[in-house]
Amino acid sequence: MHKIILIGYLLLSGLGVSAQTIPGNTGYAIPAETQEELFTSNGLQHWTDSKQIIQYFFYLRNTGSLELSIKLKTASKGNQIKVSVGGKEFLVAVPHNDKFVLKKIGSVPIHDTGFYCVTLGAFKTTGKTIADIESIQLSGSSIKGIQFNSKPRRNAASVHLRYALPDSFKAIQFYNEITVPPGGDPLYTYYMACGFKRGYFGMQVNSETERRIIFSVWDAGAEAVDRDKVSRENKVQLQAKGDQVVAEGFGNEGTGGHSHWVYNWKPGPTYKFLVTALPDSASKSTIYTGYFFIPEVQQWKLIASFKAPKDGSYLNHLYSFSENFMGENGQLFRKAYFGNQWIQNSDGKWKELLNSRFTLDATGQDGDRIDYGAGVEDGKFYLWHGGFKEANVKYGDSFTRRANNQSPVINLYKNTDSSIQAAEDRKLIYDAVSSGKYDTTAYKNGLYYKILKEGDGRYVQVSDTVVANYKGYLLNGEIFDQSKVPATFALNRLIKGWQVGLPLCKVGGKIRLIIPSALGYSIRARSPKIPPNSVLVFDIEVVAVKK
């Protein structure tokens, strides 16, 4: 009877809480491991760098005693390591053994709740390996309700902002801005600005020497790993890409079309992202295009345009996120601001997005990592994760930012690749003419043309309303549009190529225009049948003009 009472007392007082084991493969090395794998299914192994420290993090919800033990071994005699936790430091002789030995390190009084860290460092080494660590064992009254990551995935939790669209809104453009504060850009960070049901668009830190702007669109179907298994009718097709942009397929996290542009973005400046959607109900596909605004030159750049099959939808399921995509440095703090979100309806009207909802990936939802946050500062939403700081938000929390009331002004005609694309267009046109596919006899203001039939009326003027028959096609001969009956339009509302070319023709005449992309739609995706940067060919018969 006395034993039962004693056990009950111990449990209630916290002294009877079972010891907790932190697996050795859940720690972090500083500096982070590069070549040889440190953290394996057997714990910490191949720790050979005496300047490298190892850290294990945990969260205590109670004060009291903390007893620390470590299960470790080494192949070398005489090795010693320093172990510190909660302001106390211990010098530990590493057992020389071929099997792991559980060694008691010492006791630490815990006066405050919060995150704590066990730090291991080399003190004396006599061989190559400092120590192999199978696990860290914690006991004592303070560990009741302890939290730590017990899984080998060491990434910080991914954090998201979800933006709700108004009912019946047909979003054709999604605009967002990202600002990363100083120190908020560790390696292996992906700050994603414009996410939607079929893809995502943002910026990454890929290595010490490379950063990227990345735009990806998922294939149709359910294949998660191998894109070679995706049928052609389910594959995303590249329509166009910007200069020096790499475009290829991807797998292992779903499959799809990937594009990236190497660009040394920095903390401090605000970066602007724009995604457009051009749905085609006839083919049940949507063309998604990503544009990035380069602040140094104050111009937009086309990243890539992809045609997504089995779609036909407008932009929906809009979101942003911050991701730590490799776990070697998952202990580091990441933060970004997301501001000035706008969407454009199919009728051309812009709407500002003022509300967001916070969500987490499985790492956060399962409680493996609890260091994350979100909110509003200076009129912008923010996300942070990592750093083993206390969370200031929970799943599903909503936020509202103040309105800016100024929709984005976007000029895609003046873009960073204009001169390069102009040279490419000239070559394409020259090759087409040289091969005899097209004939042109004249050139004016960047436009190539040929009078196919002389008219008997006056010359067309830009201010005219024109009645005309026309056929439009790409350089490869593929027709994208043609009139069945004479069409009537105000010339000054059409593309620049028509405004330059039609005044060269008389009423009753017929003209062929070969229009470089800069005088056509440039990098814009304006038709499912016209990729960005397309050279356009038009045969136009001027029937009549009106003032």
Predicted regions and their residues:
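Short Pro-Gly-centered flexible turn/kink motifs
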Residues: P269-F273
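Short, glycine/serine-rich, charged loops/turns that create anion-binding
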Residues: L11, A75, L519
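Cross-family detector of peptidyl-prolyl cis-trans isomerase
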Residues: I410-K547
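Bacterial Sec-dependent N-terminal signal peptides
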Residues: M1-T21
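Short coil/turn motifs at beta-sheet boundaries
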Residues: F169, K266, S283, Q461-S463, ...
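Detector for glycine-centered tight turns/loop "hinges" at secondary-structure junctions
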Residues: G268, V297-Q298, G348, G446, ...
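Extracytoplasmic
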Residues: Q20-N264, L274-P279, S283-Y413
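Short, amphipathic alpha-helical segments
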Residues: Y263-P267, A423
